[in-house]
Curated annotation (Swiss-Prot):
GO molecular function: metal ion binding; phosphoglycolate phosphatase activity
Lineage summary: Bacteria, Pseudomonadati, Pseudomonadota, Gammaproteobacteria, Enterobacterales
Keyword Metal-binding: yes
Cofactor(s) it depends on: Mg(2+); chloride
Active site, per annotation: D15 (nucleophile)
Protein name (Swiss-Prot/TrEMBL): Phosphoglycolate phosphatase
Length: 234
């Protein structure tokens, strides 16, 4: 259960990878295929999960650095292009929702809370992923890494979300799993929830000092003062 209630929330924005979706498998499959195509070793899901969160360019850069190859702009460009090609397939085949995500989104929608997604993920991959997981209908705003000049941890996409929804900073809740998510929310001045699962570079989300820390996604309901799923089932 949530230990703290955030009042006055009128809309919620979510990170995507590591928050709503366990996408490490699909990312790792595509990145490993790209690395192997360049004659480099595959990194594997566990390593790739630690590189998620700053966008595809930085993920590819981290992979090439790990492979101890000479990092050039041309190699990075070619590897990124290969990753994009392979990820067109693995973005859907290698991704699944985290537990309780869909039922919680459905419950939030019943209360007419506008919801959005703010992710550093390349924009072309987002719509197919949401459609494959059957959650597109819940989001009236989706901002990908190609939709803003500055990605998280910069607050720009959160400011854009506030403006789109017509909200003051204290009325938008941002939910994420990494320090970049929490830093972006804090810079924008909006309340934030940190999830203990997901991809946070191997460190505890508590170190980023979010307003609330949740282990179960469905506890988001009680965090904003709505009945929990367990109470509804009782």
């Amino acid at each position: 259960m949530a230990s703290k209630v955030l009042k006055g929330i009128r809309a919620i924005a979510f990170d995507l990878d590591g928050t709503l979706v366990d996408s490490a498998g699909g990312l790792a499959d595509a990145l490993d295929q790209a690395l192997l195509a360049k004659g480099l070793p595959a990194a594997g899901k566990e390593r790739v999960a630690a590189w998620v969160g700053n966008g595809a360019d930085i993920m590819v850069e981290r992979a090439l650095t790990w492979a101890r190859t000479k990092l050039t702009a041309q190699l990075h460009k070619e590897t990124r292009e290969l990753f994009d090609r392979f990820y067109e397939t693995t973005v859907t085949t290698g991704s699944q929702l985290f537990p309780e995500v869909k039922v919680t989104l459905a419950e939030l929608a019943k209360h007419n809370l506008p919801m959005g997604i703010i992710t550093n993920k390349p924009t072309p991959f987002i719509a197919p992923l949401l459609a494959s997981l059957d959650i597109s209908e819940y989001f009236s705003l989706v901002l990908g890494g190609d939709d803003v000049k500055e990605k998280k941890p910069h607050p720009a996409p959160i400011y854009l979300t506030m403006g789109t929804f017509g909200l003051r900073k204290e009325e938008l809740l941002f939910v994420g799993d990494s320090r970049n998510d929490i830093l972006a929310a804090q810079a924008a001045g909006c309340p934030c929830v940190g999830l203990t699962y997901g991809y946070n570079y191997g460190e505890s989300i508590a170190l980023s000092n979010p307003d609330c820390i949740l282990t179960n996604f469905s506890d988001l309901l009680s965090t904003i003062g709505l009945p929990s799923l367990k109470l509804q089932e009782a």
